[in-house]
Design a protein with these regions (language model features):
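Compositionally biased, intrinsically disordered low-complexity regions
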Residues: 15, 130, 162-164
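Short amphipathic alpha-helical segments, especially helix-boundary/capping motifs
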Residues: 37-41, 123-128, 158-161
Length: 167
């Protein structure tokens, strides 16, 4: 929780003039980073957007939004694979841009079944997709966080700010 608070303070500072800003987390879990950001900005001055592969985590985030006065953002909470099928897009199909993006992505994950699909998307994953599969028992993992870093950068508006927890 302390890391979330520090990230929010660094991104937002004490800017009381912010209004109508968008905040996004592509690997939100239960929303700790997003809630810290909303508290720093002011719950009535921001909209929350998220995606997480876990339905259970997404449901917990919805509950957290209700408990923290952010129920207007409930329709923006999506479950799914952010890297393979990002849920938040503009009308023209491009990745939606946000004022603030925070993320604590998975660091290592077994994703060889869709690695080549991600690698083929040279626009979104312009810095590449991990090749090396490290043998870690019981199954191989790859440094998937590098893909999330690229997704975060692609999701920032031209004046947007982001913060990512990395190993």
């Amino acid at each position: 929780r302390e890391i979330a608070t520090v990230m929010a303070r660094l991104l937002v500072g004490d800017d009381a003039q912010l209004r109508g800003v968008s905040c996004y987390d592509p690997s939100a879990g239960t929303g700790t980073l997003l809630l810290a950001l909303a508290h720093q900005i002011g719950e009535d001055r921001c909209s929350i957007y998220s995606q997480d592969i876990s339905e259970k985590s997404s449901e917990m985030l919805r509950l957290n939004l209700i408990l923290n006065g952010l129920s207007e953002s409930l329709p923006n909470i999506r479950q799914g694979n952010t890297l393979l099928e990002p849920a938040h897009k503009e009308a023209n199909g491009t990745i939606k841009k946000f004022d603030y993006v925070v993320s604590n992505p998975p660091f290592k994950l077994d994703f060889p079944e869709y690695r080549d699909t991600l690698a083929a998307d040279g626009i979104r994953f312009w810095a590449g997709v991990p090749n090396a599969v490290k043998q870690i028992k019981p199954k191989p993992t790859m440094a998937i966080y590098t893909c999330f870093i690229q997704h975060v950068l692609n999701s920032l508006s031209s004046r947007g700010k982001g913060a990512i927890v990395v190993p």
